[in-house]
């Protein structure tokens, strides 16, 4: 494990190093919540955990600066638990192994947790600082952002006192985000009675892996391969041409990550095994050709292996309905923003497919900066799975964050950034969910901007943070806090 705690600036890297030692996958935050409260107590920082599981910290103003506008620094404590297929890492018990790789910090075949651990570490650095001059400060460290922004959604509307919100969950240094997409989770489920497999049939497990995956908002415009959408094309042809039957399907494991792996178990007449192997080879070539220049095609694996024939499988009619619905379900970009053609407005990610043992569950995350198109796409997906006889539920819906280009804090941030770096910052809206939109719905008078150091490939085992961006990011935060104007 690389010693990252002595990287510059040590104030941030020392705290991030501590965070990597505390397991904090979404949905399992007890250890990190306890750690943050213990850390605050030891540092002499006022802190409490609210009913939503968020940690709130408060630091009084430097004497003489009590009249300054209050600043809320915000980041989320949870991380996406993604790992390479051969990794044995247990996100609920194991620390993250960090590696310094040139100008980057990465993990050992797992997500790093810089999204949004570096934001949390920055809040900690400000809170423990003894020489930073500032007005009244609050730190809001939210729970379960990655799985549905639950901490922000359940944030009490009277908990915070600040006037300005600095969100540290943007992943390109020099970009200052003032708008983001809304989102909605769509879950389609079906219980079915399995039928017996023909005792004379053979069985194969077909696996697709080695795709890039990635963030289903930020990277959806790159046209990366979705393992579930690739697999369904193969499965439909195997059923149609080789009398294959579906026994089980497992593809994807995170609602907000493009699935990079999927596997199915198929049964079929023994005499069709050789033809199935040929079909697998053909589809591997097709996928590599289709995604040449987008995926790292030499990493793509698509193969079949003989397995014990399962006793039960999906009934033929239900199988056909499920496969058709997955095939037809929209995935990827639906519409670009008319006013900003380089920005995705509306998209969806066919994130998770789980079929087997008499149950089917399919999960999609739809995003849009336009509320109408968000619900239009969600209803389109709902209609698709309704036709397959599935029960469809919407959850976790949140509005987008409408840009305010005349924001006072944006103007100040851009001024300080140019003073420090000699170049203009880029004002941006992102096709991803940021908690800013939800917090603004509860605190509508906040002036908000989001920024952070450069991260690459978040939500994947290739996640990494650029070391050289962290020092200028820290310098910007410190000067901003020192120069916040009076109320």
Where are the model-predicted features located?
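Substrate-recognition/cap regions that form aromatic- and gly/pro-loop-enriched pockets
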Residues: 343-432
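Active-site metal-coordination/substrate-binding segment of hydrolases
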Residues: 65-163, 189, 203, 327-337, ...
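Acidic/His- and Gly-rich active-site-bordering loop/insert found
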Residues: 3-103
């Amino acid at each position: 494990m690389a010693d990252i705690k002595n990287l510059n600036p040590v104030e941030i890297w020392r705290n991030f190093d501590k965070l990597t030692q505390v397991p904090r996958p979404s949905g399992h935050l007890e250890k990190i919540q306890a750690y943050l409260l213990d850390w605050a107590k030891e540092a002499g920082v006022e802190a409490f955990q609210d009913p939503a599981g968020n940690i709130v910290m408060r630091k009084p103003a430097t004497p003489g600066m009590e009249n300054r506008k209050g600043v809320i620094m915000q980041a989320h404590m949870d991380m996406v638990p993604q790992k390479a297929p051969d990794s044995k890492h247990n996100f609920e018990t194991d620390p993250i192994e960090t590696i310094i790789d040139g100008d980057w910090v990465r993990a050992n075949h797992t997500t790093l947790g810089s999204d949004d651990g570096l934001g949390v570490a920055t809040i900690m650095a400000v809170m423990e600082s003894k020489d930073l001059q500032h007005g009244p400060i609050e730190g809001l460290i939210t729970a379960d952002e990655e799985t549905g922004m639950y901490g922000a959604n359940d944030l009490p509307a009277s908990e915070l006192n600040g006037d300005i919100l600095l969100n540290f969950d943007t992943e390109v240094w020099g970009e200052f985000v003032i708008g983001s997409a809304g989102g909605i989770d769509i879950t389609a489920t079906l219980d079915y009675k399995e039928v017996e497999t023909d005792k004379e049939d053979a069985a194969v497990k077909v696996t697709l892996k080695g795709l890039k995956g990635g963030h289903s908002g930020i990277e959806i415009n790159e046209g990366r391969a979705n393992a579930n959408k690739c697999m369904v094309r193969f499965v439909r042809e195997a059923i149609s041409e080789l009398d294959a039957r579906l026994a089980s399907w497992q593809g994807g494991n995170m609602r907000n990550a493009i699935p990079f792996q999927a596997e199915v178990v198929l049964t079929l007449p023994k005499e069709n095994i050789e033809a199935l192997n040929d079909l697998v080879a053909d589809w591997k070539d097709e996928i590599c050709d289709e995604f040449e220049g987008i995926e790292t095609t030499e990493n793509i694996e698509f193969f079949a292996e003989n397995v014990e024939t399962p006793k039960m499988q999906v009934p033929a009619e239900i199988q056909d309905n499920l496969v058709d619905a997955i095939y037809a379900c929209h995935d990827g970009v639906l519409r670009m923003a008319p006013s900003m053609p380089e920005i995705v407005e509306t998209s969806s990610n066919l994130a998770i497919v789980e079929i087997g043992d008499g149950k089917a569950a399919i999960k999609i995350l739809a995003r849009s900066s336009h509320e109408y198109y968000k619900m239009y796409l969600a209803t389109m997906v709902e209609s698709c799975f309704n036709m397959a006889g599935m029960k469809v539920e919407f959850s976790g819906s949140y509005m987008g964050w409408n840009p305010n280009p005349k924001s006072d804090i944006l103007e100040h941030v851009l001024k300080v950034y140019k003073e420090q770096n000699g170049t203009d910052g880029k004002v941006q809206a992102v096709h991803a969910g940021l908690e800013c939109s939800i917090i603004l719905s509860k605190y509508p008078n906040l002036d908000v901007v989001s920024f952070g150091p450069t991260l690459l490939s978040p939500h994947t085992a290739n996640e990494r943070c650029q070391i050289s961006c962290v020092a200028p990011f820290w310098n910007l935060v410190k000067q901003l806090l020192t120069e916040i104007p009076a109320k």
